[in-house]
Amino acid sequence: MNTPTPSHLDWLSSLTPVGTRASSSDLGATDLGCGRLSAAWEVLSHVLDPEVPAVSLVELGIVRDLVETADGVEVVLTPTYSGCPATEAIEQSVRDALSRFGTVTVTMRRAPAWTTDWITDEGREKLRRYGIAPPGPVDAGQGVPIRIVRRREAIACPRCGSTHTEQLSAFGSTACKSLYRCVACREPFEHFKPI
């Protein structure tokens, strides 16, 4: 990903302005502020998630806002869930990566809560190539029929594509993943839990 595309930044228009903000319409601008913000977005697009190093924080959808301040930049992040053990490492990675932009302030915004729907299409494909089955869509706010026996969504194997898979454990190497096995190719894999 070279620069953030408008699809990554469309939600910015709904946020309250705090300072100079990069928006989808600013990406082509050449003034110093927008150029700095575009450069900062470019840097952030290469900061990898410490628990899933196949995707960047931008692709994961946890970078919510980027604002130019008087002496640097402010980055607003939404953690994947409250209590995520990688939060401090993520904050430090962001500070280190953006240090050339001056003072880096990292703010955690927990509302609205992060959802796997915020993972970009490119991020989902990178998860798949890394061997992690990406999450399906979350239909927040839509009613779900109550069933006595819960039917599981068919999870496609990231290696062979078969949906003939079985869950081995609700818990994988991190709290946001579960462990599966493909019955077709017999390979184990992790599935990023939809939130």
Located regions from the model:
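Domain-level signature for proteins that mediate thiol-based redox and metal-cofactor handling
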Residues: M1-I195
